[in-house]
Amino acid sequence: MRNRTVAAGAVLTAALLGACTSHPPTHISSTASVTVNGHDRTFHIVKCGQVQWTRMIDIGSEFSGAKVVVDENAQPATTQSVRIRNVGGFSGMYSQGGDGNADMSMTGDKFTVSGTANGYQTDKPSEPAAATFKIVVTC
């Protein structure tokens, strides 16, 4: 009986420690819209996560979509980076301190990010291109 009590205690301790160190579940939003050079695209796969004051928003798939990183500790909150993957025939990025720009507004859990990104047209990957973008997502 003592061995069962010790074993049960060990299992309970391991479960509690595992719960303390696991990451919170990723919030999945219903939809996001991404507009690049006037081409609108709606995505139904949106994953939002947060580490301390940094919010990561992953839209779409690895083949087509966008990833937005927001610094919510800044006053006001700012967009650190935007990576666009094959939306409207464009792939590229904006990075804070680099070329391009990004303006962000946040109302509750709704983020709107718009600006310009540098990259390439997917049908002409060897030629640099710039694009305007607007991303609206709720996390």
Curated annotation (Swiss-Prot):
Pfam families: Myco_19_kDa. Keywords: Cell membrane, Lipoprotein, Membrane, Palmitate, Signal. It is found in: Cell membrane. It is a lipid-anchor. A lipid is attached at residue 20 (S-diacylglycerol cysteine). A lipid is attached at residue 20 (N-palmitoyl cysteine). Belongs to the mycobacterial 19 kDa antigen family. This is Putative lipoprotein MIP_01412. The lineage of its organism: Bacteria, Bacillati, Actinomycetota, Actinomycetes, Mycobacteriales.
